[in-house]
Amino acid sequence: MPGEGPSETENGGTADPLQHAAIAGPLASGTTPSLTLARSVVCEPDAIMIMPPFDLFVAQLSSDSTEARVDAMKKLAIVGEAMGLEGTLSKLIPFLTENITNNDKDDDDDEILLNLAGQLAVMVPGLVPGRAALPLLPILERLCSIEETVVRDKAVETMNKIVPLLFPWGNSDDGAPFGTLLATAKRLAGTDWFTAKVSAAGILPAIYAFWYAHATKGESDNESRRELRILFKDLSEDDTPMVRRSAAKHLGRFVEAVAGLTDSAEALVRGGKPQPVIADEDKRLVTYELVPIFQALSSDEQDSVRLLAVCCAGSVGCGLAREPSVTAEVVLPVVRGGCADLSW
């Protein structure tokens, strides 16, 4: 008999019984199993149709076929939605942690890891809101250390999306996120391998901005922010050019975070917005801690580092409250030097 809708299939003939069959149970939402899924899971077709979402995900991810594993990872957020928040936190995330975070070998296909990093961003904040997303950070930390650049970049991008959402209502009644974020930054910045350090420079601005927005400004919080600034300074002085290049690339955002700017320098200048009032202490930190980093990176021996540092001039100027005299003294010499640089 012909099916009455796209979720049913013909039982006779030689047609693939899975090609148009909808998954029953928690995934019965019109989603049809792909041929990749049908060929990758070794079990009877009827068993696939009633298999719980998590078991189906694990089975496909355990396939010998790279195509099947990539296909499974692309559906991670869908699996999470089918499992719900409780199932995601109790089963799905621990499974990913065990297989990704605790895996010391980079033997997973880069495309699988790239899709994992992207799917984690999709899961927040809809499925895993606020501090419930904290268990995702160790997974992303591991991905931030992967050798493949596109995987690291996607992990940093996802981390930067998740960090501001850890307190969606500005509620900071416990210190768990602060301790976790600081420890994550320290581990990435303190490793011997440059890949993690490159990622550390990319997430420090978001972590500092989170601290600035939600911490109590007490003595311990001031010390933690000082540690974050020291981490960034150390990265800017690293022996490896790739690390210094990453520090130069993200210096502008770090300056904006330290100055407490809620808008980027580009948004302020191009949007014609008035300069926000910057607290004297924040301006002092920019002047005496970050301006020297800006000046050092803009005169780095590597031309790629110098170029990225000069591009941060607008952020530095906004971090100094766009005061004409300070801009003329601090920012313009760097811009003039960049204009006269013979490397470009």
Residue ranges and their predicted role:
Residues 1-344:
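Extended, low-complexity, acidic/polar intrinsically disordered regions
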